[in-house]
């Protein structure tokens, strides 16, 4: 939905002022931040996950370019392949049909506990919740999730004045009346998902 929204807003509202004439890199980074680092900041776990940086968990999603935003090729959790597209597990080659999403090395056995984390309050962490409950996953205390605001969000800190007229339901942002027509098409839809 995030990629669909990014495309729809570009069609409805035009290019962002920060984007170059020949690309939408800022828009892409902005919408990627909405589903990666910004939720991590809001939930107090950005010191561990949410971006690719030294010292953080190696959580990555790899995409074939033609399926970006729709169907990931591989999900790497804690530096180990956790979920991937694989063929028949009894076959001698990994690409034998039918290709399906399957759990991989990082999601099996004891690896799951080593590549994942359970986030708890600092009080729970200090009271030894991991030992008390016998948890196998890493237990990490959340940090700074009460004193954050929109200004702390990455590439999404704009906080306009939003007003809704109670009689006409007209929405204005910074005094500008906004209307967006219904979508006529949605990217990454039926072409990628059969139902």
Task: Annotate each predicted stretch with a short phrase.
Residues 1-66, 72-78, 82-87:
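His/Asp/Glu-enriched, well-ordered alpha-helical/loop segment
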Residues 67-70, 86-171, 176-195:
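Non-catalytic terminal accessory/regulatory regions of metabolic enzymes
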């Amino acid at each position: 939905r995030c990629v669909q929204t990014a495309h729809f807003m570009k069609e409805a509202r035009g290019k962002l002022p920060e984007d170059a004439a020949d690309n939408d890199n800022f828009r892409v980074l902005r919408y990627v931040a909405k589903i990666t680092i910004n939720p991590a900041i809001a939930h107090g776990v950005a010191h561990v996950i949410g971006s690719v940086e030294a010292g953080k968990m190696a959580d990555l999603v790899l995409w074939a370019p033609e399926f970006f935003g729709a169907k990931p090729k591989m999900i790497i959790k804690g530096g180990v392949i956790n979920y991937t597209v694989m063929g028949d597990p009894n076959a001698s080659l990994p690409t034998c049909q039918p290709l399906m999403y399957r759990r991989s090395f990082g999601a099996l056995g004891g690896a799951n506990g080593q590549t994942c984390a359970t986030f708890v309050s600092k009080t729970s962490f200090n009271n030894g919740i991991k030992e008390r409950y016998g948890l196998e996953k890493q237990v990490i205390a959340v940090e700074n999730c009460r004193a954050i605001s929109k200004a702390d969000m990455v590439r999404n800190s704009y906080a306009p004045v939003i007003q809704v007229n109670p009689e006409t339901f007209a929405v204005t942002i910074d005094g500008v009346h906004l209307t967006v027509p219904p979508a006529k098409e949605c990217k990454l839809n039926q072409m990628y998902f059969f139902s």
